[in-house]
């Protein structure tokens, strides 16, 4: 039996020392192929950078869209809350008008019977509380008498001759108008001079 060392060498193979010498020879791959490969990799890198830039821009655009959407929803929530508040306040104003009419038509204090005084005082207290509550909510009455008619705040329901007032001056207020912040929730109904 022949050992591995004893095997005869095939004719086409050179001894190991001779093969080692050929390993240090010029590379088999020509230089232009390496340059082509580098150019190919640089092109791929550029394409990836462009794709990355596009994706980054898309992410930034989506983030901006989301931020705008969030702000819009916040504004809508605030507006909805204000509209609900305005609706409630607008529905309360006729009650306040009735309280004012009761007080305006009450007899003079000395003419009020003793038994009726607590009722009148109760209505006055109710008016004070309503006024304070409305003020806390940001509601304030619109000034009218003696001012020029301003259609943003006043609604003229009639005109009368008034010798002491200039034309379009408010001489009488039929119904008080109110503001909620800067927004008119009810125009003041007024009578103006001609």
Curated annotation (Swiss-Prot):
The keyword S-adenosyl-L-methionine does not apply. One of its GO terms (biological process) is protein folding. One of its GO terms (cellular component) is cytoplasm. Its main location: cytoplasm. Residues 21-40 have a biased composition (Basic and acidic residues). One of its GO terms (molecular function) is protein-folding chaperone binding. The keyword Cytoplasm applies. InterPro entries: GrpE, GrpE_coiled_coil, GrpE_head. Residues 1-53 are annotated as: Disordered. It is found in: Cytoplasm. Pfam families: GrpE (PF01025). Keywords: Chaperone, Cytoplasm, Stress response. Signal peptide: none annotated. PROSITE patterns: GRPE. Belongs to the GrpE family. HAMAP family: GrpE. Homodimer. Participates actively in the response to hyperosmotic and heat shock by preventing the aggregation of stress-denatured proteins, in association with DnaK and GrpE. It is the nucleotide exchange factor for DnaK and may function as a thermosensor. Unfolded proteins bind initially to DnaJ; upon interaction with the DnaJ-bound protein, DnaK hydrolyzes its bound ATP, resulting in the formation of a stable complex. GrpE releases ADP from DnaK; ATP binding to DnaK triggers the release of the substrate protein, thus completing the reaction cycle. This is Protein GrpE. It comes from Chlorobium phaeovibrioides (strain DSM 265 / 1930).
